[in-house]
A protein has these predicted regions:
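A short secondary-structure junction signal
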Residues: 85, 114, 124-127, 165-167
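Charged helix-capping and loop-helix junction motifs
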Residues: 16-17, 45, 128-136
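Structured beta-strand-rich core segments of catalytic domains in phosphoester-bond hydrolases
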Residues: 12, 30, 34-120, 218, ...
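Short glycine-/acidic-enriched loop or helix-start segments at secondary-structure transitions
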Residues: 41-44, 48, 125, 163-166, ...
Length: 261
């Protein structure tokens, strides 16, 4: 599962309850969250949501401004070992965007789960291309034997349409940055045939969105992989309905079932 939880925008306190309710209903084994808040004096949104689920959690390294940080998080039913990696700008210099590289001690073996949030600007495709290429390199360095092990999962808010260069280079629609590593996009494999918009004008939080009707959030499964491990069995959206009068986030979540044996 992946979900951009919209930091502390809008009615964030009411939304926190709605986020928890949606997560409880979906009961994901592993979820990547973006735009997670942490207070410098200790309160941590990821920790609170994980506690409600009974999950382990990890976040990217927080950088505080005015007492608050904006991070990516992974919540998991199983123990996590995680590190933070900085992602580049188009010119190769470090940006403020990060990836959380998590190794999860799952009952079916080690699961490499990478959660990220790429640059958002409409005209920043070149930056997102550099960031996607770096993600591929990081995953290639970290993955287990692709002929034997469960494949890596890449999740996040990519702020890009599926025909954009940054997505095409991950899915093998153009030359991949790391030969021998591409990713299956879970939605066209396991979705319901709809566009799968996660940035949808039906969401009341997007009443004034500049460019709605977009699928910005993705779950990717690494390839090559030993069939049938990692095969997408089903993919769906979550978080579309209001909980106690509030929709949980401005993005809808993407959830998938993967074959584990």
């Amino acid at each position: 599962m992946t979900w951009n939880v919209w930091w502390r925008f809008g009615p964030w306190q009411q939304r926190q309850q709605a986020l928890g309710a949606v997560l409880a209903a979906q009961a994901p084994d592993v979820v990547g969250l973006q735009e997670v808040w942490i207070e410098e004096d200790g309160r941590n949104q990821a920790a609170e949501l994980a506690a409600d689920l009974g999950h382990h959690w990890a976040t990217t390294t927080p950088r505080f401004r005015d007492g608050l940080a904006f991070v990516n998080a992974v919540l998991s039913r199983w123990p996590i070992e995680a590190t933070t990696a900085a992602l580049p700008r188009a010119d190769g210099t470090p940006s403020h965007r990060q990836a959380l590289l998590a190794d999860i001690d799952a009952p079916f073996g080690r699961l490499t789960f990478v959660n990220t949030h790429l640059d958002f600007a409409f005209d920043a495709s070149a930056t997102r291309v550099a960031q996607a290429a770096e993600l591929a390199r990081l995953i290639a360095d970290r993955r287990s034997d692709p002929q034997e092990a469960f494949p890596p999962v890449l999740a996040g808010d990519f702020n890009a349409l599926d025909h954009a260069d940054e997505i095409r280079l991950l899915t093998g629609a153009t030359a991949p940055p790391v030969p021998g590593l591409v990713f299956t996009d879970a939605w066209p494999v396991g979705g319901d045939g709809s566009p799968g918009y996660t940035w949808d004008p039906a969401n009341p939080h997007l009443a004034e969105a500049t460019w709605p009707n977009r699928r910005l959030d993705y779950l990717f499964v690494g390839w090559p992989r030993p069939k049938p491990l990692g095969t997408v069995q089903r993919c769906w959206l979550a978080g579309q309905s209001a909980v106690a009068g509030v929709v949980a986030s401005d993005h809808y979540a993407v959830v998938a079932d993967l074959r584990i044996g």
